[in-house]
């Protein structure tokens, strides 16, 4: 019974929680001790193989690069190294080069169903760079591949919440929204999305024809409106001119002579008047006075 009770007590949650930190501390202590021994042996190897070991221990990274160093599987304190020369211990240190330059990624055409149920094909280009070399290596397996996949998904999701006319007329706004969304999502991967540009929006052929017909109809309607407005202005001008000519007999005669001059110039003909214009005017005035007297009587 005593043996059974001791086994039961060792499996109680309270006992497990109490012994777990101690076991973890012991394992950490053993790992640190083993690590110190390996580091010491590595330094001994460097000293014994001088100066040949310097060819292995010293590395160089370019201005646009950083080196993330792991010692016995753990990140070395101090962050990424570079640019310039840095030192590693043989056999126990490993490092990864990270390029900090801006990269471009052409998002392949994505078939998207817009908010108003129109299928369009949209492609874009994404400009991004590594902003934190250590995080881009330690937090994600492949930061570049993950960013590209996320760019495709973000493009589809963003376009799916917009109407077709918004996609066609608000490209800059949509690009800015995508850039903010991508930058926020990739911050945990050490990636900075600098810019997103929508390259092309391709519509179905039938929709293109329908939009072209609609645009043609709109142009014809505008042309008819402009023509109607022109006719209205011309009619108004003619009415004003007729009022002016009616109030001035001299203006009527001048206009009459101008018309005759135009006719004779076009047809190259001679016009003969049986009566002078003054006599015609006199008869016209006599007729008007006669009609006026009879109307009063």
From Swiss-Prot:
Membrane topology note: Single-pass membrane protein
Superkingdom of the source species: Eukaryota
Positions of region (Disordered): 1-30
GO cellular component: plasma membrane
Annotated Polar residues bias: 1-13
Entries under InterPro entries matching the protein: Band-7_stomatin-like, Band_7, Band_7/SPFH_dom_sf, Band_7/stomatin-like_CS, Stomatin_HflK_fam
Pfam families named in the record: Band_7
Keywords attached to this entry: Membrane, Transmembrane, Transmembrane helix
Subcellular location: Membrane
Protein family (similarity comment): Belongs to the band 7/mec-2 family.
Protein name: Band 7 protein AAEL010189
Stretches that traverse the bilayer: 37-57
